From Swiss-Prot:
Any GO BP annotation: L-cysteine catabolic process to pyruvate
Recorded family membership: Belongs to the UPF0597 family.
Domain of life (superkingdom): Bacteria
Single GO term (MF): L-cysteine desulfhydrase activity
Protein name: UPF0597 protein LCA_0156
Length: 431
């Protein structure tokens, strides 16, 4: 195996992982569970949570899995009472119904507080838990489970260098040196046994979609797209591939944002990005009766493309990255429909000229709408590309080459929307 292939596979294994619940409140639950693992008395006297503005934005409205309630107070209480920090972003996957009264009592007792930290980090979480005997503080930055500091009273348990406020991981730094052609060639040519693990994304996220169709989560957007035919307002999903892609992706997001206890396979630290990169590819694979190898290669191409594009974006920002995740899906769907590398480039260029720049105004049930928007853009972009049509580079942020366009999208998210984030949070906190 070449060194480049090893780096690509490591990027997939680092960036495509299961997560139960929206990853920002789950990072707080992970922090609380980490603290509790160091306490022996465990009679909680206080839990203090401090998070960066982007984490606060993404935790205000989204449901904490298994609790039926949103917010950081509930997330911290859930992690403290029912969390297992050893399983990372699946920290509260084992939460039981019998835990719920204790969790909600703690969350609403006044013992748990959450505030915005005055830090420049895109992603920062600090949790302090006091019991009758000890005080433990954990600090996380850079990624959702990256602990750089852990203290118990005056004892330092973990003391790593704090990541720079906008630092990129090793995987992101590697991806930034690559190009889309290298991503495409890897997904097409890497021995299948090296990629087989990517099938889990298909399995997990389709199960989440089915849960969204079965239960009334959030906006019930996925259900409503199929149900539109009852009102003579649409064709439903049975005979409409585009609608089916949108409905399945929206249903999975409905479930995730609505508090389902099933894990999503995430991408770039986001379940909704993972859903967006996965579901359209899975639906397309079913439509063309793809082989297992074609499905796996398409998922690997989709997720690695999404990771490549996201490597130029902040881990959290005002840029809704379901759109960049859907660009990954576009590549995977083009491959399944016997398209070429050039067709995939054209599909992504078409998307860049469409909905790139959709804002992230925090996690919540409306994320399903944004997932649907991104997948709809993907369908239009691929449809044009497969018919030989591409938006000319005289238009907007569409550049002469695919990699220039991707770098431009990175600039849009990193520089262009920098001042947008605090305005969004101010509106959210003062309405």
């Amino acid at each position: 195996m070449s060194l480049q292939s090893k780096h690509f596979i490591q990027a997939l294994k680092n960036g495509v992982v299961p997560a139960t619940g929206c990853t920002e409140p789950i990072a707080v639950a992970f922090g609380a569970a980490t603290c509790m693992a160091q306490l022996t008395n465990r009679e909680i006297q206080a839990i203090e949570v401090h998070v960066s503005p982007n984490v606060m934005k993404n935790a205000l409205a989204v449901m904490v899995p298994g609790t039926g309630e949103p917010g950081l107070l509930v997330a911290a209480a859930a992690g403290a009472i029912a969390g297992d920090a050893t399983v990372g972003l699946s920290v509260i996957e084992g939460l039981r119904a019998t835990d719920l009264p204790t969790i909600l009592d703690l969350a609403h007792s006044g013992k748990v507080t959450a505030k915005t930290a005055l830090v420049p980090d895109d992603l920062y979480v600090e949790v302090t838990i006091k019991d009758l005997e000890n005080t433990v503080t954990v600090a996380i930055a850079g990624s959702h489970t990256n602990i750089f500091s852990l203290k118990k009273d005056d004892q330092i348990l973990i003391d790593h260098p704090r990541p720079a406020a906008h630092a990129s991981s090793e995987s992101k730094q590697f991806l930034q040196t690559m190009n889309f052609k290298a991503v495409w060639d890897f997904a097409m040519n890497e021995p299948l046994e090296h990629l087989r693990f990517m099938k889990e994304a298909h399995t997990l996220n389709l199960a989440l979609a089915q849960d969204g169709f079965t239960h009334d989560y959030g906006l019930q957007l996925g259900q409503s797209i199929n149900g539109a035919k009852r009102n003579h307002f649409g064709s439903g999903t049975e005979n409409d591939l585009g609608n089916r892609m949108i409905a399945y992706a929206a249903a999975a997001s409905d479930a995730r944002m609505g508090g389902a206890q099933l894990p999503a396979m995430s991408n770039s630290g986001s379940g909704n990005q993972g859903i967006t990169a996965t579901i359209p590819v899975s639906v397309a694979a079913d439509a063309v009766q793809a082989t297992e190898e074609q499905l796996i290669r398409a998922q690997a191409l989709s997720h690695l493309t999404a990771l490549y594009i996201h490597s130029f974006l902040p881990v959290l920002s005002a840029f809704c990255a379901t759109d960049s995740a859907a660009m990954g899906a576009a590549a995977g769907v083009v491959y399944l429909y016997d398209g070429t590398y050039e067709d995939a480039c054209h599909a992504i260029q078409n998307m860049a000229g469409d909905a790139a720049g959709m804002i992230c105004d925090g996690a919540g049930c409306a994320c399903a709408m944004k997932v649907a928007t991104a997948v709809s853009s993907m369908y239009r972009g691929v449809n044009l590309a497969l018919q030989g049509i591409v938006i000319p580079n005289s238009n907007g942020i569409v550049c002469p080459t695919i990699d220039e366009t991707i770098h431009g999208i990175g600039r849009l998210g990193t520089e262009g929307l920098r001042e947008t984030d605090p305005v969004i949070l101010d509106i959210m906190l003062n309405k």
